[in-house]
Amino acid sequence: MLCAVYKSRKKAETYLFVERREDFSRVPEVLMSTFGRPELVLMTKLDPAKPLGIASTSRVIEALGSQGFYLQVPPPPENLLEQHKAQLKVSR
């Protein structure tokens, strides 16, 4: 399956996968307004055997088939303070 990947100019590390280049007809308007003007990053062939960066390839393919788009958001930031506290408890 071929798809287009766009990055958001408003939201860092946020990407929108759509089935066809420049076709945002199945993406809700509220999402598009939050996402901002999309900037094409790449056109790619999705292959379940080949992993993507953060997203699961099979999940992206499934979302494209069912809703026509997939939104990839960045993982939550690490809470380094909590990690440090947990390490201190373990070492005692």
From Swiss-Prot:
Domain of life: Bacteria
Ranges for domain YcgL: 1-85
Pfam families: YcgL
Gene3D superfamilies from the UniProt entry: YcgL domain
Protein name: YcgL domain-containing protein ASA_2166
Record organism: Aeromonas salmonicida (strain A449)
